[in-house]
């Protein structure tokens, strides 16, 4: 990183020119975004500056905090010092700010839509594995109660959570009860047992079978019906609502069936195509969901950041349209 391997080439060449010319102007670099968002990646950006700048001791840095709500054009990071000391790092700190702010903002929005219900962060399979650690931390700061991989949970010393998956059920020849029994038998009791119940497209029937077999050991069931299917319990009720996928009527059917047989303790988790809008619809209708598993929608959108030199040797020197903007919320980084 310090040598510029991951940096846009023109930053590498800019530093090379300054070093060869022995020209070390003290600049003020101002970083901002253009959207209302919840900030992420600041801790990483600071770590990059501390570990990869040529001389951290020559820099003065001010920043907001991960999780802070930010306005368009608000300065989130301010760097002062010899430009050659950190010139090649711009690509890197802007990249982590953009990535983690996107994940954190999307997660915060679904968390707010779901309140007081819980949100589980489940998009690991939708992107490269190398982004998991920081993404998980951004989601954690944004309010997700759990993540699906140990890597995502590593920055705060936790571990991934999950359910009995479709693949394990298939490995036991489609027997959801048997797969769940094996989970209960072979996994620690400290691990909450949550089972996917849509393998046979009969969420009510499967939920009841699993609940009867496992009793208090069953923490919850997860409904993940595909958008192209109509669950068996919904077919007789069709006509006045969208019947496909995970819909309010299906969730109510499962909740009512479990309650009738005394399984009020069993939680219901829903997943599959959930967005801010769909969660809001569920909450407005009072759908008896206990938690939402949200995946690919948490990687959508653009939350880009821009860095500009706005002062040189303490005097205004930015390109047209860019000027120093003070932000009293910034705090000095030690």
Set out the residue ranges of the language-model regions.
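A generic structural signal for well-ordered coil/turn residues at beta-strand boundaries
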Residues: 25-27, 217, 305
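Alpha-helical scaffold domains
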Residues: 30-31, 127, 299
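Structural motif
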Residues: 64, 198, 269-271
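Gly/Ser/Thr/Ala-enriched C-terminal appendages of enzymes
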Residues: 1-13, 21-23, 34, 38-40, ...
């Amino acid at each position: 990183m310090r040598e510029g391997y991951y940096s846009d080439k023109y930053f590498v060449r800019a530093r090379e020119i300054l070093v060869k010319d022995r020209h070390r102007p003290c600049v003020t670099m101002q970083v901002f975004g253009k959207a209302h968002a919840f900030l992420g990646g600041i801790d990483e950006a600071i770590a990059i500056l501390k570990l990869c700048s040529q001389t951290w001791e020559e820099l003065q840095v001010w920043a907001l905090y991960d999780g802070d709500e930010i306005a368009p054009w608000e300065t989130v990071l301010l760097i002062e010092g010899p430009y050659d000391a950190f010139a090649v790092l711009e690509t890197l700190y802007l990249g982590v700010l953009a990535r983690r702010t996107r994940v954190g903002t999307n997660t915060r929005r679904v968390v707010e839509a779901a309140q007081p219900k819980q949100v589980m962060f489940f998009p690991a399979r939708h992107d490269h594995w190398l982004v998991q650690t920081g993404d998980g931390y951004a989601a954690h700061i944004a309010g997700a109660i759990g993540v699906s991989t140990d890597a995502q949970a590593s920055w705060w010393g936790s571990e991934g959570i999950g359910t009995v998956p479709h693949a394990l059920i298939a490995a036991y020849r489609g027997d959801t009860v048997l797969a769940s029994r094996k989970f209960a038998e072979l996994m620690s009791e400290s691990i909450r047992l949550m089972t996917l119940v849509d393998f046979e497209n009969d969420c009510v029937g499967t939920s009841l079978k699993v609940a009867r077999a496992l009793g208090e050991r069953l923490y919850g069931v997860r409904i993940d019906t595909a958008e192209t299917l109509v669950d068996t319990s919904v077919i007789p009720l069709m006509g006045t609502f969208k019947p496909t996928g995970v819909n309010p009527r299906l969730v109510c059917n499962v909740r009512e069936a479990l309650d009738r047989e005394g399984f009020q303790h069993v939680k219901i988790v829903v997943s599959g195509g959930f967005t801010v809008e769909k969660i809001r619809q569920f909450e407005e209708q009072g759908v008896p969901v206990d938690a939402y598993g949200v995946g690919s929608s948490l990687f959508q959108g653009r939350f880009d950041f821009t860095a500009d030199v706005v002062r040189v040797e303490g005097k205004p020197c930015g390109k047209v349209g860019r000027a120093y903007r003070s932000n009293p919320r910034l705090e000095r980084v030690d």
